[in-house]
């Protein structure tokens, strides 16, 4: 009986690990500052955040790549906000992504900053 329970746990472990991922939409605030415009605006949007199933092999072959999965945008739209106080001739708009859905997938370094999120600066800087 003990052997059967152990075998069942080992069989279900990968399935349960994948089921416990928590990649999904998260509400975030973004602060945008333009020195020439002399102002700072903060607005809310949605991004993708959470955990994805990943594993790291003990033996690594130089013939095989080992991509890790991250919580990435699946569907996205872009919205634009108006930057107040800008002099004429300046770009008065800031365009940003809004996540509609998320998925666990390999991070595309061509279009995404795949590094850790910088949480040290939470708003606009004062000079």
From Swiss-Prot:
List locations, semicolon-separated: Secreted
Glycosylation sites noted in the Swiss-Prot or TrEMBL record: 27, 44
Q: Does the keyword Glycoprotein apply?
A: yes
What keywords is this UniProt entry annotated with?
Answer: Disulfide bond, Glycoprotein, Hormone, Secreted, Signal
User: Which PROSITE patterns does the UniProt entry name for this protein?
Assistant: GLYCO_HORMONE_BETA_1, GLYCO_HORMONE_BETA_2
One of the GO biological process terms: G protein-coupled receptor signaling pathway
Q: Which InterPro entries match?
A: Cystine-knot_cytokine (IPR029034), Glyco_hormone_CN (IPR006208), Gonadotropin_bsu (IPR001545), Gonadotropin_bsu_CS (IPR018245)
State if Kinase is listed as a keyword: no
One Gene Ontology term, aspect cellular component? extracellular space
Instruction: Give the family from UniProt.
Output: Belongs to the glycoprotein hormones subunit beta family.
The annotated subunit structure for this chain is: Heterodimer of an alpha and a beta chain.
**Protein name (record):** Gonadotropin subunit beta-1
